[in-house]
UniProtKB/Swiss-Prot annotation:
The gene is argG. It catalyses: L-citrulline + L-aspartate + ATP = 2-(N(omega)-L-arginino)succinate + AMP + diphosphate + H(+). GO terms for biological process: argininosuccinate metabolic process; L-arginine biosynthetic process; urea cycle. This is Argininosuccinate synthase. The keyword Endoplasmic reticulum does not apply. L-aspartate binds at T123, N127, D128. It comes from Wolinella succinogenes (strain ATCC 29543 / DSM 1740 / CCUG 13145 / JCM 31913 / LMG 7466 / NCTC 11488 / FDC 602W) (Vibrio succinogenes). Homotetramer. It is an enzyme of class 6 (ligase).
């Protein structure tokens, strides 16, 4: 420890890890600790974190609990989905996209209460430490970051439990503990650890929390319609919904039909491969629908440019660069392409599948007069001859210069 820290804002869940961190910060840094708990749709009550923080000596005015579900979906999830974002071709970035939001509010609270440091419970082996800290430095350049997992020797659950018992930290006993490390928000739930550390092992069926097995899903497809305005989903089956309400409803529908399960070995930013399983039912449906409405409303070169940029954009989010100038620049371009992405998409949900069932838009670029296979009066097929010859010119020149 170099310069004295006066006040720390801790990203606090109320669980074992962050409760131990809270006490450890008080002991090691001898400073005031402020707790921040975010409700981003993880499905657990967040208010118990208030009582637990009080029990550990945190003043009422230093306990912050915020409902961020609408902000999360509106300002983070939806902008990401405008790009049809997938990391390494599969991952919908459910964990990655939540971290900049938490970092933003950590910094806002730090400025509000006059804190000079922030702290988080991410380990020194994962991506989250990078995401939290890059966000912190981008928004508060002089902030100090305390990452206990990189400092202490409490590197096992047994040691954490022993520390908690020694310091009177209450540990909830909820029956049999899950063998998996789980992280949830409105976009997804992730599973790591346990038998998943062996890539050859198949996940157990009772691991999945949000979805039924596709084998056990209803035998009849369910039809839905999603309405879009300027690239964002705004309603389901003609009913307007807020962003968070809409995503929650898509999660319910997708989970009912076994949609959105993913078993992935991914390349972490810190250099290692990791295996995780994800449930993203609503996001899986939303991605399919968004691509469908774009197919009607985007120009060809806009579509291809977006597809070329998407892997770079996805990596920026995965690696923690949400607040970077390059991500903002890409976002501006992506958002510009969405001004005509308005219309509706019909889907059938059936046993793990999202099946397109029609799309329509008043801004559609699909012109039957040109694309029909029947006789038309607007397209002169003879024009194609010159088009082809001009595009073939370089091949003709090269072939004559270098005959095979």
């Amino acid at each position: 420890m170099s310069k004295k820290i006066n006040k720390i804002v801790l990203a606090y869940s109320g669980g074992l890890d962050t409760s131990v961190i809270l006490k450890w910060l008080q002991e090691q840094y001898q400073c005031e600790v402020v707790t921040f708990t975010a409700d981003i749709g993880q499905g657990e009550e967040v208010e118990p974190a208030r009582a637990k923080a009080k029990l550990l000596g945190i003043k009422e005015e230093n306990i912050f609990i915020k409902d961020l579900k609408e902000e999360f979906v509106r300002d983070y999830v939806f902008p990401m989905f405008r790009a049809n974002t997938l990391y390494e071709g599969e991952y919908l970035l459910g964990t990655s996209i939540a971290r900049p939001l938490i970092a933003k509010h950590l910094v806002e609270i730090a400025k509000e209460v006059g804190a000079d440091a922030i702290s988080h419970g991410a380990t020194g082996k994962g991506n989250d430490q990078v995401r939290f800290e890059l966000g912190g430095y981008a928004l508060m350049p002089d902030v100090k970051v305390v990452a206990p997992w990189r400092e202490w020797d409490l590197n096992s659950r047994e040691k954490l439990l022993a520390y908690a018992e020694k310091h009177g930290i209450p540990i909830e006993k909820k029956g049999k503990k899950s063998p998996y490390s789980m992280d949830a928000n409105l976009l997804h739930i992730s599973y790591e650890g346990g038998i998943l550390e062996d890539p050859a092992s198949e996940p157990e069926e009772d691991m999945w929390r949000w979805s039924v097995s596709p084998l056990d899903a209803p035998d009849a497809p369910e039809r839905i319609t999603i309405e879009f305005e300027r690239g964002d989903a705004v309603g389901i089956n003609g009913v307007k919904m807020s962003p968070a309400t809409l995503l929650a409803e898509l999660n319910r529908l997708g989970g009912k039909h076994g949609i959105g399960r993913l078993d992935l070995v991914e390349n972490r930013y810190v250099g290692m491969k990791s295996r995780g399983c994800y449930e993203t039912p609503g996001g899986t449906i939303l991605l399919k629908a968004h691509r469908a409405i774009e197919s009607l409303t985007l120009d060809r070169e806009e579509t291809h440019l977006k597809d070329e940029m998407m892997p770079r954009y996805a990596s920026l989010i995965y690696n923690g660069y949400w607040f970077s100038p390059e991500r903002r620049a890409l976002q501006a371009l992506i958002d510009e392409t969405q001004k005509n992405v308005t219309g509706s998409v019909g889907l059938k949900l059936y046993k793990g599948n999202v099946i397109l069932a029609g799309r329509t838009s008043e801004r559609s670029l699909f012109n039957t007069a040109y694309s029909t296979f029947e006789e038309d009066s607007v397209y002169n097929q003879k024009d194609a001859e010159g088009f082809i010859k001009l595009n073939a010119l370089r091949f003709i020149i090269a072939g004559k210069a270098n005959p095979s």
